[in-house]
Design a protein with these regions (language model features):
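N-terminal membrane-anchoring alpha-helices
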Residues: 1-16
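Active-site-proximal beta-strand elements of phosphoester/diester hydrolases
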Residues: 19-29, 144-153, 173-177, 237-244
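Active-site neighborhood of phospho(di)ester-bond hydrolases with catalytic His/Asp-centered motifs
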Residues: 24-26, 51-57, 80-86, 131-134, ...
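Core catalytic region of metal-dependent phosphoesterases/phosphodiesterases
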Residues: 36-138, 223
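Short, conserved loop/helix-junction motifs that constitute active-site signature segments
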Residues: 47, 72-77, 165-168, 187-190
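Solvent-exposed loop/turn segments at secondary-structure junctions
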Residues: 58-61, 86-90, 138, 152-155, ...
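Binuclear metal-dependent hydrolase catalytic cores centered on His/Asp/Glu-rich metal-binding motifs
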Residues: 95-128, 134-135, 140-185, 251-254
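Conserved beta-sheet core of the metallophosphoesterase superfamily
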Residues: 179-262
């Protein structure tokens, strides 16, 4: 296994409910040359998830649509929810790695457009639900899940006002690619139970720090200490940020920050 599986249980379900296993992945950044990563993705079916959630950046190459669909093939037979990230819309372009340590000035150097409409169509054909500025009520093992999402906040495509409102069902979850504070605060105001995000790569390059490691950046306004894993502030929603599986073709490395997927098991309270 060339990645880390982050596993955690959360007591969010009503008493007497069956456990729900959620596979959360993000930032695959797939290209035709990512053979090891593709093999890891195909192995996830053995985790036997009840629900699959992707928080975007599936693609990193104009010929990656078929690659991604092949890698995800068996998972697409399961219930799935997804949103997109900036690299699903545009081919990555070179950026000075040191620029990630500076304050974001809002400028985006975008590459050529990717065939995201084709990819989106194929995902929906297989039954996965697009939550880019959309909301859906799904039922998993008898539990009604109010799921809402936003398009990529890094490109300012998020329109949470279109999905806001009192939560319905047994639990409410949010899905977004880049965990900007405006999105997280809006979801907290709606009293969601759990939010899934990606984008940060866990910092991608981390420094050893008192028995662990520390991120230097999140590439958004999320505090560095929340760059990966499950965290919570006071009574706000639990936030699971995936450090992701891949990386930009122009920065093909991870330092003290392994690729990862998350298996979150929702259990009764």
């Amino acid at each position: 296994m060339a990645y880390q599986l982050r596993q955690v249980s959360l007591p969010l379900l009503p008493a007497g409910a069956s456990d729900i296993r959620i596979l959360h992945f993000s930032d695959l950044h797939l290209t035709p040359r990512r053979g090891r990563e593709i093999a890891d993705i195909k192995s996830w079916i053995r985790l036997k998830p009840d629900l699959v959630i992707s928080t975007g950046d599936f693609l990193a190459h104009r010929e990656a649509v078929g690659v991604a669909l092949n890698a995800l093939n068996e998972l697409l037979d399961l219930p799935g929810l997804y949103v997109f990230g900036s690299n699903d819309y545009h081919v990555p372009k070179f950026r000075n790695p040191l620029s990630y340590l500076r304050k974001d000035n809002g400028e985006r150097n975008l590459g050529e457009k990717l065939p995201i409409e084709e990819f989106d169509t194929e995902l929906r054909k297989r039954g996965w639900i697009n939550l880019n500025n959309k909301r859906s009520l799904i039922t998993i093992k008898g539990i009604a899940i109010d799921a809402r999402g936003t398009d990529d906040a890094h490109l300012e495509l998020d329109e949470y006002e279109g999905v806001t409102g009192e939560k319905k069902g047994d639990i409410a979850i949010g899905i977004t690619h880049a965990p900007y504070s405006r999105v997280l605060e809006a979801m907290a105001q709606d009293e969601l139970d759990l939010v899934f995000a990606g984008h940060t790569h866990g910092g991608q390059v981390r420094i050893p720090w008192f028995g662990g490691s520390r991120s230097l950046t999140t590439n958004c306004d999320l505090p560095n200490w929340r760059s990966r894993g499950l965290t919570r502030i006071a009574n706000q929603p639990h936030l699971n940020v995936s450090a992701g599986m891949g990386y930009s073709p122009f920065a093909p490395f991870r330092i003290f920050c392994p690729s990862e997927a998350s298996l979150i098991t929702l259990i009764p309270t």
